[in-house]
């Protein structure tokens, strides 16, 4: 990797009280302590052997989608948008409304047919690869605001998306929104046309004998009209949901159309006693001022849904052993912190800071330091 390469890098660890970035030595010490906490609280991981522990930079693209909003697009395609949107009726059915229908039974049959069709799951599957979900994206906002231009000296993961890919994702997203607006328009037009048809039919129910038939027609029309309104409401909710997947440029303090941010995270590979490989991700976190005795590491998440979803999604993707898994593992092994003398010195200074700041009880500091040393010596042997 070119040591002179630079990029906009978001921190892995910040203080909760003021979002100040934690210095590198303290960051490494606390993130490894968090890893140890994560490892020891799962019985099946306690006897596992470390393979690597690395800091990695995950490529995140923020690209303008519309006048003010930005989509977050994952450069490694861990994430995607999978969704069902409401469709309109088969256009062949609409032609029947143009026919001249003069008898009551045929009118009721037609309206009943529309009701039956509308009761079907009129849905279309949508999948847009790479879009990051709102829980992750909103959770990253504080970090994105703290991102700064830095040398890319950590384990930079090469993005698998080109500028053309990013534009294609935005176009797909915009097309889905446009399609939903068009579907709303179609439902409105159908509703208006149907209402006019019913209005024309009403005048033909003029005598006393037709009152029961007119009542039946009105009831069927009211039922159908209500269902059409529900479809329109569904479409509007789907549009609102899709808008929730984007962030305002004002929220991000961004004005340029395409922004690339590197999100700092830590990843460990371990071998379980049954020889299965497992990956443990440490997403960006905060140094909390409120840690209980049962949770002895002073590191917590920005909010639980962000941390949990990001951690589980990436770990599951890596555990599935895709070609991307091997690419990331090879990259992390090449930057294995257990094997770097600079990292050993850095973490020693970090635990000295932890002790001075009284961030952890001394007994836990010694356990974690011992585990680092054992892993380092084992992998160097």
Feature locations, PLM:
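Soluble extracytoplasmic regions of secretory-pathway and membrane proteins
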Residues: 1-381
């Amino acid at each position: 990797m070119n040591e002179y390469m630079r990029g906009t890098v978001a921190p892995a660890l910040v203080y909760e009280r003021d979002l100040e970035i934690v210095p590198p030595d303290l960051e490494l010490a606390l993130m490894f302590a968090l890893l140890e906490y994560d490892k020891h609280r799962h019985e099946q991981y306690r006897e596992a052997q470390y393979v690597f522990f690395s800091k990695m930079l995950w490529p995140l693209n923020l690209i303008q989608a519309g006048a003010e909003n930005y989509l977050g697009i994952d450069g490694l395609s861990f994430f995607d948008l999978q969704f069902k949107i409401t469709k309109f009726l088969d256009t062949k059915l609409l032609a029947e409304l143009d026919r001249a229908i003069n008898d009551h039974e045929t009118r009721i049959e037609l309206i009943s047919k529309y009701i039956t069709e509308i009761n079907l799951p009129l849905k279309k599957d949508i999948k847009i690869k790479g879009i990051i979900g709102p829980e992750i994206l909103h959770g990253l906002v504080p970090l994105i605001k703290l991102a700064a231009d830095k040398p890319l000296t950590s384990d930079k993961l090469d993005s698998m998306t080109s500028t053309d890919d990013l534009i294609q994702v935005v176009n797909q997203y915009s097309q889905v929104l446009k399609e939903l607006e068009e579907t709303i328009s179609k439902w409105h037009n159908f509703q208006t046309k149907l209402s006019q048809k019913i209005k024309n039919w009403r005048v033909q129910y003029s005598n006393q004998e037709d009152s029961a038939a007119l009542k039946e027609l009105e009831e069927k029309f009211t039922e159908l009209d209500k269902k059409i309104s529900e479809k329109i409401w569904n479409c509007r909710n789907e549009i609102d949901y899709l808008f929730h997947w984007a962030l305002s440029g004002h929220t991000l303090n961004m004005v340029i159309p395409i922004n690339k941010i590197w999100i700092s995270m830590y990843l460990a590979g371990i071998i379980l006693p049954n020889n299965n490989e497992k990956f443990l991700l440490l997403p960006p976190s905060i140094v909390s001022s409120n840690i209980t005795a049962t949770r002895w590491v002073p590191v917590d998440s920005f909010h639980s849904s962000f941390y949990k979803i990001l951690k589980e999604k990436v770990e599951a993707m890596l555990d599935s052993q895709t070609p991307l898994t091997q690419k990331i593992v090879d990259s992390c092994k090449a930057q294995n912190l257990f094997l770097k003398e600079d990292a050993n010195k850095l973490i020693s200074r970090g635990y000295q800071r932890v002790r001075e700041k009284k961030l952890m009880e001394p007994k836990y500091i010694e356990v974690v330091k011992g585990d680092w040393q054992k892993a380092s010596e084992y992998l160097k042997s």
